[in-house]
Structure formats: C-alpha cells, structure tokens
A protein has these predicted regions:
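Conserved N-terminal beta-strand and adjoining loop/helix that marks the start
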Residues: 1-22, 44
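A generic fold-level signal
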Residues: 4-6, 16, 32-33, 85-87, ...
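Conserved Nudix-box catalytic region and its N-terminal flanking loop in Nudix hydrolases
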Residues: 20-61, 149-150, 155-162
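Low-complexity, intrinsically disordered Gly/Pro/Thr-rich segments
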Residues: 141-149
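Residue-level signal for short segments within beta-strands and strand-turn junctions
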Residues: 13-15, 25-26, 94-97
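Unchanged
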Residues: 45-68, 78-134, 157-162
Length: 162
C-alpha cells in the first residue's frame, strides 16, 4: 500500500529573548480530538503551496503574526496519527523572529507563552515529549523521525540527523 500522508507544518514561535514558546491550548471545541492538549501552531499544506509558504500562512491564520525568520528543525512521519488512522508527514519549524502581536486566542483555543523549561509539564501528545527536545536543542542539523501511532497512542520512535 502506498504511503500517501497528509503533509503538514508545525511551528514553534519563540519569544524575542528565546526563553518562551507560543503554544496553543486546544480548549475551544468539545469535538476536538486534541481537546485539552498543548501544541505548536500549524496545519495542512494546501495544494500548490510549498511547506515554507504553508508554515507562514498557518502562523498568520492561527497567531495573527508574520514570520520574519524561520528555521527547519526537522521532519516527522506519523503513520496512523490522524483521528481516523490517517498518516501525517510534518515539517517542523522554529520561528525566531516575527512581526506583530500574537492573538490571545483563535477558534481552536488559547495562545499561551510557555517557558521552554516547563514544556514537559503540559498535557500534550505523548510523542511530543520525545521530539520537542530536538526542536530546541541548538544542534544545527535537522532531525528526521518516524513515530507510528495506533488508536491515539505512540507505538515507537526513531530518528536520525545528518
């Protein structure tokens, strides 16, 4: 069976001092399969859109700011991750400079600045705890990981860097 994932972006907006990250607390829609979890910002890449343009658009739509400086931190394949078992392929970015003032909330939930050293305390997808340290570790090499899910649970995790 061919691998035809949903292509998406996931971005982590850093505060100007680099000590905090803008997270969405998915608390607005009772039918949200991510209800109660914290996550970065992002979403599906649209047809005829490259991943960088998709990341910029998602940050604009979800946070109301413009990305001035981005860095690709890695890619992640999430087989079986979707609500109905769909496969996802994510391009993960940090946004280190932006223009504008972030929104306080959007239709998915509240936007909150969180200290980087407190991220591990938040309710989030189990797998995020494995790859988030790689997003913020300062290693200039992007990581490339695979994290299969089944029934909403991470099954395994592996990655490489080059």
């Amino acid at each position: 069976m061919p691998y035809t994932p949903i292509v998406a972006t996931l971005g982590y907006v850093l505060s100007p001092d680099g000590r905090r990250v803008l997270m969405i607390h998915r608390n607005a829609r009772p039918d949200d399969h991510q209800l109660g979890k914290y996550n970065g910002l992002g979403g599906k890449v649209e047809p005829c859109e490259d991943v960088l343009a998709g990341m910029r658009r998602e940050i604009r739509e979800e946070a109301g700011i413009e990305c001035d400086e981005l860095q690709l931190r890695g890619t992640l394949s999430w087989p079986g991750f979707g609500k109905h078992g769909e496969d996802w392929l994510g391009f993960i970015f940090t946004i280190t400079r932006f223009s504008g003032t972030p929104l306080e909330r959007n239709p998915e939930g509240a936007l909150e600045w969180v200290e980087l050293d407190r991220l591990h305390e938040l309710p989030m997808w189990e797998g995020d705890r494995h790859f988030l340290p790689l997003v913020f570790d300062g290693d200039p090499r992007p990581f490339h990981g695979v994290m299969p899910y089944r029934d909403g649970r991470m099954q395994s995790w592996s990655y490489s860097r080059f």
